[in-house]
A protein has these predicted regions:
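Intrinsic-disorder/low-complexity recognition with aromatic hotspots
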Residues: 27-119
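A contiguous, mid-domain pocket- or channel-lining segment that forms the substrate-recognition surface
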Residues: 47, 66, 117-240
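Beta-strand elements within well-structured catalytic alpha/beta cores of enzymes
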Residues: 52-65, 113, 282-288, 313, ...
Length: 437
């Protein structure tokens, strides 16, 4: 009988733990699965999107957090309610030479992060928590009902050479936050489970060096007698030395050992380890930003979690830079809905189907503010967007109801997908050209 650890190892590294062998040797899993073809022909055919391909860290919540209440674009109208806590004081920040106002935590981000930070004012068109999977499917706009993170993962996997094409969910706090791939529900792998599996005395990372030697020995005869000159040169350029393996092993062990729980900072550590092991192109996190705050006296929960949430993003960006991954990873957020903004929301906020703010931080997307917010019904909602400028416009060619699909199209375009593929994967909306770097 397969135990839980074996099942998790198989999920992470594939049958025969080929992904772990790839980590130990430096060789792509595709070579280990079919070494004869790889050795005979040299490097595999290149991916058309390699130069733009990114790992994606998706922050997603079925709670409908009030991110939309404290970002640029919400401070021009004095009737919009903000936390009065000094920690959330309206503060100026500069993005791409333009001055905006946001809650203090956003303004405290390093300028290097602000230079890549974009706020997207969108409409998800639902006030219902369990509709989170539908929002990730762009409310019916995706091909065959695929989730946006899964579509991204499927197209990015061959470009990044990841072990698997399925995304991984670490932070799901409810069933509605789980991911599907091709209609199949995917397992949730919390940070502590990843730590326990990989760092135990008999865990995967403690045996990388012997696994490297064993795998290369198995390939040696084929390498010596069956490899073309191009194949040998390609393999030689990829194989990790024993010293490199020791460095990889110790670095990942140190990183994972520091995980103490399943909170946002621990999810960040686990996600970085998964990227460094090249397991998957897309990892879903849950960083709280106020939660389902119907009753939130003085908006204190919103304040506390926004301060902590932005700090978690700052920590993530610092760790990406330290690991040399700042140009290889894009942070994206997408929640089921936002919260109400009007004057009656000083002690809590209600569900808002008309306004949700997403965030992107990465080299593929231009920093700034996409769209805007204005009065809608009894509260506020996202405004129409001009697809050429990205600005809110009364007669914009992207009405609020297609802003979510347009966001999805722009995400796919940003990581290098061909326009025809983008249109096929997301059948509504438009690419917002000004949002692309």
């Amino acid at each position: 009988m397969i135990n839980r650890r074996q099942a998790l190892m198989s999920t992470l590294f594939g049958a025969g733990y080929v992904g772990l062998r790839a980590l130990a040797t430096g060789l792509p899993a595709s070579i280990l699965l079919n070494p004869r073809r790889a050795l005979a022909g040299g490097p595999p055919a290149g991916c058309a999107t390699t130069t733009k391909a990114q790992y994606i860290l998706l922050n997603t919540s079925g709670n409908g957090d009030p991110i939309n209440a404290n970002v640029p674009g919400t401070y021009e109208d004095p009737k919009i309610t903000h936390s009065l806590d000094p920690a959330m004081a309206p503060t100026s920040l500069t993005i791409q030479g333009q001055t905006y106002t946001a809650a203090a935590p956003w303004a405290a981000l390093p300028q290097s992060v602000l230079d890549r930070l974009c706020f997207w004012h969108l409409m998800t068109n639902t006030p219902v928590h369990p509709k989170q999977p539908d929002v990730l499917k762009l409310m019916g706009a995706t091909q065959a009902g695929e989730m946006l993170p899964s579509s991204l993962a499927r197209h990015l996997a061959p470009c990044l050479g990841t072990i698997q094409s399925e995304p991984i969910s670490q932070g799901a706090s409810s069933p509605s936050e789980g991911l599907t791939y091709g209609g199949r529900a995917l397992p949730i792998i919390p940070a502590l489970a990843l730590k326990a599996t990989l760092t135990s005395p008999a865990g995967a990372l403690t045996n990388l060096q012997p696994l490297r030697d064993q795998t290369l020995n198995q390939l040696y005869d084929l390498y010596r007698n069956g490899a073309s000159p191009a194949g040998k040169a390609y393999i030689d350029s990829l194989v990790t030395s024993q010293q490199q393996v020791r460095s990889i092993q110790q670095g990942l062990l140190n990183q994972l050992t520091s995980i103490k729980d399943n909170t946002a900072p621990s999810q960040v550590l686990a996600a970085l380890a998964l990227i460094q092991m090249n397991v998957t192109p897309v990892i879903a996190l849950h960083i709280p930003f106020g939660g389902d705050n119907h009753r939130d006296i003085g908006l204190q929960t919103e304040t506390t979690q926004t301060v902590a949430g932005v700090a978690a993003i700052a920590g993530l960006m610092a760790q990406l830079a330290s690991a040399g991954l700042a140009d290889k990873v894009t942070f994206v957020s997408l929640d089921v809905f936002g919260r109400t903004l009007g004057p009656a929301n000083t002690d809590g906020r209600q569900h808002n189907p008309n306004h949700q703010v997403s965030i992107t931080i990465g080299k593929s997307f231009r920093a700034g503010v996409i769209g805007g917010v204005g009065p809608v019904g009894n509260d506020y909602g996202a405004l129409s967007i001009d697809s050429k400028t990205g600005k809110a416009a009364p007669n914009g060619d992207i009405p609020p109801v297609t802003s979510l699909a347009s966001f999805g199209r722009t995400m796919l375009a940003g990581v290098g997908l061909d326009p025809a593929v983008v249109s096929y994967e997301v059948g509504e909306g438009q690419v917002i050209a000004s949002a692309l770097a």
